[in-house]
Amino acid sequence: MLCRCSPLLLLVGLLTLRSALSQECAKYKVSTCRDCIESGPGCAWCQKLNFSGQGEPDSVRCDTREQLLAKGCVADDIVDPRSLAETQEDQAGGQKQLSPQKVTLYLRPGQAATFNVTFRRAKGYPIDLYYLMDLSYSMLDDLINVKKLGGDLLRALNEITESGRIGFGSFVDKTVLPFVNTHPEKLRNPCPNKEKECQAPFAFRHVLKLTDNSNQFQTEVGKQLISGNLDAPEGGLDAMMQVAACPEEIGWRNVTRLLVFATDDGFHFAGDGKLGAILTPNDGRCHLEDNLYKSSNEFDYPSVGQLAHKLAESNIQPIFAVTKKMVKTYEKLTDIIPKSAVGELSEDSSNVLELIKNAYNKLSSRVFLDHNALPDTLKVTYDSFCSNGVSQVNQPRGDCDGVQINVPITFQVKVTASECIQEQSFVIRALGFTDTVTVRVLPQCECRCGDSSKERTLCGNKGSMECGVCRCDAGYIGKHCECQTQGRSSQELEGSCRKDNSSIICSGLGDCICGQCVCHTSDVPNKKIYGQFCECDNMNCERFDGQVCGGEKRGLCFCSTCRCQEGFEGSACQCLKSTQGCLNLQGVECSGRGRCRCNVCQCDFGYQPPLCTDCPSCQVPCARYAKCAECLKFDTGPFAKNCSAECGTTKLLPSRMSGRKCNERDSEGCWMTYFLVQRDGRDNYDLHVEETRECVKGPNIAAIVGGTVGGVVLVGIFLLVIWKVLTHLSDLREYKRFEKEKLKSQWNNDNPLFKSATTTVMNPKFAER
């Protein structure tokens, strides 16, 4: 299998080398060899003496290797340090699965250094297994079976490894509402059956430190009692965080670490603690006191990402042994937690041994190669060449599945620095395994120029030669240290080479020598850079037909401005000097309402090309010319006596021409119709007035007044008649109602209230005869 990988590794290496050689050199403000090396991985420096000519900057020494060779720099004079990787031989003794153990990298900015890491899975590697169990009431039958597992569990480990140890811990949930019932009686016995003996709820209890004594495991687990809580999710993530954060209390060795997490329900995570008024985020530290997580009610649950980071940091591989209904939930959790597995637990945990074996085989047959946190200036990628023939390139971490015992697999690691970095180190590890690779990183930014670096005569005995460039002594500057500063600082000298305080020295196109700009010679053919501050050139002008200033026949470029030859004009000399296309029939340029540019009228606002004759949006000054129309045509109105003086520039046209129609009143109240015909220029009009006017007779005042008075009187009489009729009808209706009431008031008997004025008395003694 190694033979199959070698050609692929060679191909990747060749492609990387070809890519590096084909890179361009984007140099900027380069004056030294170090500046050049930092400019990019494609840049190289020529240390040949007198390689740069008169007026050329030192930056011409910095270019791609191909360009430098083409310019006459021999290969021995080209300084081009490359990124390197040096591996240290593996230490003898011990069972090592990862090699090499130490690598030293010399990194040039932008250029990757590559090295190979080999992983060989060992047989019988030591294992520590910690069994973390949910003791909520629904796990009662599971606890009964786990109490019998001690010897079987350790025997199962010994089938896999020569050195196995087991430990035990349990969890329920935080002991505050709404997670558990906080009634004192329920806190003492949280089980639904009061006759059942249960232990008080707790967050996490470390029961048994990792041991190889199966009898001790069975004894300690046998003492455990079931507990209970209120809500369905459990506090399992709290317990896992403590198992990972307390290595000494748990007893972890530097071997393969397995954490079996057994539960039949989901889990609380960060933010759920707010339901119980717990706001402080989980700090990821160990808080075990007397083997109990007593600070559970002070810290929120950990987030899944926080737990994943802690497990990876502690090199712990979790195995989630969950019931059928929770398998999909925990499979999603394994997508976030690397090197984790899920197994379906039977309702009574009777298959836990088989589950652990299968999960371990699955975990140990897959290898992830990863590194610890790095600064932004370093980038690490992995190419994985697996034993099953599957390959992956440029991945953020190495990944191979189906790894077999004693069959090596190769990872190619590529490390790239974005700038010259400080010396530092980082660690590469295979997740779930204890072996690591320590990578020491050093910068590769210095130029090792082994030529006449001590020759001072080439620099006028006032400096030394370094990589083909003079490095002047204090008080001297210049390409050959020929300029003495005479006590002036470099800032003062450079100030006279700046156009203003905000500009760069010599516009970035020259060198400041003794306070004066010496402009560079351009690499562009026929381009000349000049000016006091090298701010001018003969190429930076507008172009016409792809040529600067339209070509030498049309114009020449002087300091960003085109100077046109005779017969041409325009910002790029693109126009012929002619106005023929701008003249109207009268020979007036743009009708006096625009300017002729490039033989085309540029009309004033509102007027339309081609000759600026029409202005659809302009307002017609009809009222302003009404008095002139009256005096010129009818010899009346306010201007009648001095019409020639007031309207001297306005002509009366004998016949109607195209123009704007106007209707205005004259001094006699008649309506005039006339046409305004615009002449060349602005506000210049001639008139054509219609012969007839429309005069309207004045109103008959007497008829209007008489009609108005008569109308008012008639309206008044009509209103009185209506009022009288309505009044009569109302009286008639009231009279009829009175008559009707009168008929209703006739009596059939005497009025009981009436008393007659005559009284008749009968004499009883009187005898009738």
From Swiss-Prot:
Motif (Cell attachment site): 397-399
Binding-site positions, Ca(2+) 2: D173, N229, D231, P233, E234
TM spans (from-to): 701-723
Annotated signal peptide: 1-22
GO BP, sorted A to Z: cell adhesion mediated by integrin; cell-matrix adhesion; cellular response to low-density lipoprotein particle stimulus; integrin-mediated signaling pathway; leukocyte cell-cell adhesion; neutrophil chemotaxis; phagocytosis; positive regulation of leukocyte adhesion to vascular endothelial cell
Cytoplasmic side: 724-769
Cross-referenced SUPFAM superfamilies: EGF/Laminin, Integrin beta tail domain, Integrin domains, Plexin repeat, vWA-like
PROSITE patterns: EGF_1, EGF_2, I_EGF_1, I_EGF_2
Assembly behavior: Heterodimer of an alpha and a beta subunit. The ITGB2 beta subunit associates with the ITGAL, ITGAM, ITGAX or ITGAD alpha subunits. Found in a complex with CD177 and ITGAM/CD11b. Interacts with FGR. Interacts with COPS5 and RANBP9. Interacts with FLNA (via filamin repeats 4, 9, 12, 17, 19, 21, and 23). Interacts with THBD.
Protein name: Integrin beta-2
Organism: Sus scrofa (Pig)
Lineage: Eukaryota, Metazoa, Chordata, Craniata, Vertebrata
